[in-house]
Design a protein with these regions (language model features):
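Soluble FAD-dependent oxygen oxidases
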Residues: 1-423
Length: 423
């Protein structure tokens, strides 16, 4: 395990010298398995978890091995918060370098939109600072494709006042309420002001293993306003209601159980557009539930519709950062968990099929208006152009500049390509 940027530089020197395969582990939460490797070494940053808060500048600096719980808890001591994920044992590095959506995205944009600078160790072993005013082209690449360019040993984020508690937690419904829940989602799409979010999940969680629909609510404000905003859902009669006022630093722990570490995993992503046809969602749920029910020990699986407002996200042009998933749509993910390796291929095939059907609601995807594929949710078979769209050419040119030998290639898709100048 490394404990400093100097350790990372020294490790990379040995990797280059002896041509050793390697990967980098931040929080160890990689949905693609990129935080582990066979027949190679892991540059493990988990001993680098220091978080520093500058109360005057309202910034938070987190070392490369931090998880979001570290950031949330430390920032909260000063009444501050920044845009993190929705599960607090996710690594700061992985989520940030791939873009980063969270409950505060509706108000402040993506995690990378609030990233001020990084300290990064390049393939050469050189340690540099990248920001909007220093190594600007590298910073552009880091904001969406950072895993391809080096090991980030420190991140500095803009933080915001978050002294009030937030209203959050799940309402649980039986599947017969799906049409009405979808109608509310369609309404939410029109009336939210960025201070709200809703995650709709299909699952049949143990020990009951009964199919349910979970609606994870978020409202950055008082309880009376929150219950009024979500009143359509309350009127449906949830079978369980665990939503309440909680400290912000507890918010990102609410989904931790659904993102546990046991079993085999398949995580895939796509996009969907609102308004949704309720009958389509009913059909998708039926297919998901039938598949899960027909396999042993798969009840920890989930399909998640992330209704996180995108207005602030699309205020930033797709060419402004390497992240190319800025569009008028929302992310959807499948998270399958099982224990029998004999069905690995079957699960991957089914996941792709289900996501394809859902993503067909986004008919207007294009390389310059948002690709409809969140890189942090992408499986290994998704190509670079599908994630980075029109930005892929510049990324590959920068890859040639900063990592011409493709040292950072584990789990990544970019190929170093020299800039071609046409006279």
């Amino acid at each position: 395990m490394v404990t400093s940027a100097d350790d990372v530089s020294a490790t990379l020197a040995q990797i280059r010298k002896h041509n050793i395969s390697f990967t980098v582990r931040g929080g160890g939460h990689s949905t693609s398995g990129a935080a582990s490797i066979e027949d190679g070494i892991v540059i493990d940053l988990s001993k680098m978890r220091k978080v520093t808060v500058d109360t005057q500048a309202k910034t938070v600096t987190a070392e490369g091995g931090t998880i979001w719980e570290d950031v949330d808890v430390e920032a909260a001591k000063y009444g501050l918060a920044t845009v993190g994920g929705t599960v607090n044992h996710t690594g700061v590095g992985g989520l940030t370098l791939g873009g980063g959506y969270g409950y505060l995205t509706g108000k402040y944009g993506l995690t990378i939109d609030n990233l001020l600078s990084v300290q990064i160790v390049l393939a050469s072993g050189e340690q540099v600072i990248a920001s909007s005013t220093s190594n600007e082209d590298l910073f552009w690449a880091v904001c969406g494709a950072g895993q391809n360019f080096g090991v980030v040993t420190a991140f500095t984020f803009q933080a915001y006042d978050q002294k009030n508690q937030v209203f959050a937690g799940p309402l649980v419904f039986l599947p017969d309420k799906i049409p009405q829940i979808v109608e509310f989602a369609n309404k939410f799409h029109k009336v939210n002001d960025g201070n709200q979010a809703m995650l709709m999940a299909f699952s049949a969680p143990p020990p009951a293993n009964v199919p349910v629909v979970l609606c994870q609510l978020f409202y950055n404000g008082p309880e009376d306003e929150a219950t009024a905003f979500f009143s359509d859902l309350y009127e449906l009669g949830p079978i369980a209601n665990m939503a309440a006022m909680i400290p912000y630093e507890k918010l990102n722990s609410l989904l931790n159980q659904g993102a546990g570490f046991d079993g085999r995993k398949q995580f895939g992503g796509g996009a969907f557009k609102l308004p949704l046809d309720p009958s389509l969602v009913v059909q998708i749920h039926a297919e998901f539930n039938a598949f899960v029910a027909s396999h042993e020990r798969m009840n920890g699986s989930m399909m998640l519709f992330e209704i996180i407002p995108y207005k602030k996200v699309i205020e930033v042009p797709n060419a402004k950062t390497s992240f190319a998933n800025r569009g008028d749509y929302y992310n959807v993910a499948t998270m399958f968990k099982w224990f029998n390796p004999a069905i690995d291929s079957e699960i991957r095939t089914f996941s792709r099929s289900l996501l394809k059907k859902t993503s067909e609601t986004v008919a207007s995807r294009s390389t310059d208006r948002g690709v409809g594929q969140y890189g942090n949710y992408a499986t290994a078979d998704v190509e670079a152009n599908e994630i980075f769209g029109a930005n892929v050419k510049r990324l590959e040119e920068l890859k040639h500049k900063y990592d011409p030998d493709n040292l950072f290639r584990h789990g990544n898709r970019l190929i170093p390509r020299p800039l071609v100048v046409v006279n």
